[in-house]
Amino acid sequence: MNISMVGIDYNTASIEDREHFTLTSDKQLEIAKIIKETYHASGCIILSTCNRTEIWFSELGTSEAECFHQLVLGENAKETMRSICVCRQGDEAVTYLMELGCGIHSQIFGEDQILTQLKQALQQARDYQYVDSVLECLFRTAITAAKKVKTSIQIAKGNTSLPQTIVEQLEKEQGDLLGKSCLVIGNGEMGRLMTEKLLEKKCKVWMTLRQYKKSKAIIPEGSGVVLYDERYEHIAVMDYIFSATKSHHFTINKSMFENIRLKGKTYCLIDLAIPRDIEPSVEELSDVTVYNMDYFCQEVNDREKELEETRELLSEYVNEFKQWYQFRNLVSTVDDISNIVSDITDAKLTKVYKSIDLSREQQELLQSNVQMAAKKAVSKIIFGLRDVLQIDQCEEVLQALEQSAMNCTDSVK
């Protein structure tokens, strides 16, 4: 299979490293255009999240790693950056994507957000028309497989999102969060999820909002609102500050923060962004603790049974996709045979149609339904060959069937 991927994730790259691989939507579109027009790939899909940046290719005619280095890192990338990239091809890539959708390769084992991110990556590729039928089918199959795993196997135990994990770990380490004052900087999906989890714990929560987005914002019920430009006026009295924006500049910097702190008060800052929202030097302040998302990762312990069951179920979807991939070039031949059989059926039943007392509209409807039924029956039988024959055998049989069908057409005429 000429399917491949290249990328980095939290396993190979630290937060500091992952910052260099972050791709905006505009940058993703620019890269996809080059992959299609310059590297002549049949299709591509780009997945860019806080924990991973991956490019998926169909029919790429050059080195995946070289393509990634040139388009994402640039020619002046350090060798250490190049060394953390991972390439997967063929069966390995297909199996990896199936597992990825289930959360097996996520920091929070079994988390659900990766499935949403796969859907969004696929939809963006559709919207900008840089996905081909192969990657379309692969990602749809992976999404379907992940949904099946989620409903059939309990691979996640309790916390299936980063915000949930953060809340649980903060309670474990620092005690009850009831009544704690929290500021969430950022009104995107992660910010809203974090706010909702904090509200569930009966925290007093405020979210920042940029003035120009005020009318479009979705604020979880129970949360207060703070204008983004006024955030420093409120930070001083907060117990916890969470930052989850897509900004490429710091939302909290050391010089501003150290001047607004209250004497004798300790602060807990949680950075949920890549690139980071909180200036690293803030950690130098003695009364401040800064956490990043890597701190809250969940180790995979005692998951052998769930992993075995998941992989066994996923193997069915992997095989299903591989069969489709091998058979896809024969679909037009199957359609041709089905159409010929439909025409023959229609010709053979002409006298029967005329002998039945039906109106013209009823006769046309009956004729159309019979033709459709004939097409479906033939297609189903022929596609069933995939289960009993090798691909080369299927090709030979289809060629023979097509020739036979055409001969039948000649005799009917």
Curated annotation (Swiss-Prot):
This is Glutamyl-tRNA reductase 2. GO terms for biological process: protoporphyrinogen IX biosynthetic process from glutamate. It is an enzyme of class 1 (oxidoreductase). NADP(+) binds at G186, N187, G188, E189, M190, G191. Substrate binds at T49, C50, N51, R52, S106, E111, D112, Q113, Q117. HAMAP family: Glu_tRNA_reductase. Catalyzes the NADPH-dependent reduction of glutamyl-tRNA(Glu) to glutamate 1-semialdehyde (GSA). It catalyses: (S)-4-amino-5-oxopentanoate + tRNA(Glu) + NADP(+) = L-glutamyl-tRNA(Glu) + NADPH + H(+). It comes from the Bacteria. Pathway: Porphyrin-containing compound metabolism; protoporphyrin-IX biosynthesis; 5-aminolevulinate from L-glutamyl-tRNA(Glu): step 1/2. Homodimer. Signal peptide: none annotated. It comes from Lachnoclostridium phytofermentans (strain ATCC 700394 / DSM 18823 / ISDg) (Clostridium phytofermentans). Possesses an unusual extended V-shaped dimeric structure with each monomer consisting of three distinct domains arranged along a curved 'spinal' alpha-helix. The N-terminal catalytic domain specifically recognizes the glutamate moiety of the substrate. The second domain is the NADPH-binding domain, and the third C-terminal domain is responsible for dimerization. The active site is at C50. Belongs to the glutamyl-tRNA reductase family. Its EC number is 1.2.1.70.
